[in-house]
Regions:
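Extracellular hydrolytic enzyme modules, especially secreted metalloproteases
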Residues: 68-70, 140-142, 146-307
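Zymogen propeptides/activation segments of proteases
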Residues: 1-180, 276-308
Length: 308
């Protein structure tokens, strides 16, 4: 039903990407800013979220790895992803000012919360530290807002986790044209800290991946998407977000440059090693139509793919 579709989707998605000229490898830094509201305080600490994003072997409350661990595994050790966590800072207005639903059900002012977060952050950091590819843009700004996310069934006044693009602004001589955000707490009741799945999905956008589910449902046709097999689809919620799925092979190969692709040109018997650990385990079969091809990989229940 529509409610289920809404729970499985992220609104305000940015499907456009800045051009990439190099593989997403090496040391990368992201800026994570914790924001409470005038009427909703943060219950977790900066240290709590530093652990969720950065701690190797993170195991708080049943977790099976941190955001750092996730990107280390899915990149086959090629990406070392560190998040600098700042805050929490207090927003000027109550939660409903930012998260109430406006036209089409979209949140009315989450961009204002982002601007307030940046005003606090630039007093403490140098934005040039967050431009790994040297293109003059801040690579990744992620907001963690107090309380729950609307996508988990929280109040309509809550913010829905998303990534958004906007006309670029300039701060400290650096351009910023996107941000992402997820909630402090998981679900819609209780005090459990958020899981890494939604964070990995939204940060996947910042690195250059698109959504792989039907973002407009039946408008212009329907698309079943990559489902639980892909963090950029329903797979961000695998095992309640504890063990989000790997990226699909197209993203790994062509967006991020993490895997090698072997094009098969002759009939024969071929073997595929599990792609969880084998970075050159993808085959390509061209169909004969320009730009149309299949990618083949072997997926097993292992590592962050354990909940497939």
């Amino acid at each position: 039903d529509e409610a289920q579709k809404k729970r499985l989707s992220y609104r305000n998605r940015a499907v456009e990407k800045r051009g990439r000229h190099a593989a997403v490898v090496g040391e990368r830094r992201a800026l994570v800013i914790l924001m409470s509201f005038a009427d909703v305080s943060f219950t977790k600490t900066e240290a709590d979220f530093d652990a969720l994003f950065n701690e190797p072997g993170y195991a708080v409350d049943g977790a099976q790895g941190s955001v750092y661990d996730y990107f280390r595994e899915v990149s086959y050790g090629q990406l070392s992803f560190h998040c600098d966590v700042l805050g929490p800072y207090r927003a000027v207005y109550p939660m409903a000012y930012y998260g109430s639903n406006g036209y089409g059900g979209s949140d009315v002012n989450p961009y204002v919360l982002f601007l307030e977060a940046m005003e606090h952050a630039v007093r403490e950091i140098d934005l040039q530290d967050y431009d790994a590819d040297g293109d003059g843009y801040v690579d990744n700004v992620h907001i963690v807002f107090a309380g729950y996310g609307e996508e988990a069934g929280a109040s309509p006044s809550a913010i829905w986790s998303h990534e958004a693009m906007f006309p670029e602004i300039t701060m400290q001589g650096m351009k910023i044209d996107r941000y992402s955000c997820t909630p402090e707490l998981r679900g819609n009741r209780g005090g459990g800290i958020s899981r890494i799945g939604p964070c990995c999905h939204e940060m996947g956008h910042a690195l250059g991946a698109m959504d792989y589910y039907d973002t407009d449902y039946t408008t212009g046709g329907s698309f079943e998407g990559t489902g639980v097999w892909d963090v950029m689809a329903q797979g961000s919620w695998n095992n309640d977000g504890i063990t989000p799925a790997h990226f699909n092979p197209y993203v790994k190969a062509y967006d991020f440059g993490w895997v090698g692709v072997t094009t098969l040109t002759h009939t024969g018997d071929y073997s595929l090693h599990p792609s969880t650990w084998e970075k050159d385990g993808v085959y390509r079969v061209d169909t004969g139509s320009e730009g149309d091809f299949y990618l083949l990989e072997s997926r097993v229940r292992d590592g962050f793919d354990t909940a497939l």
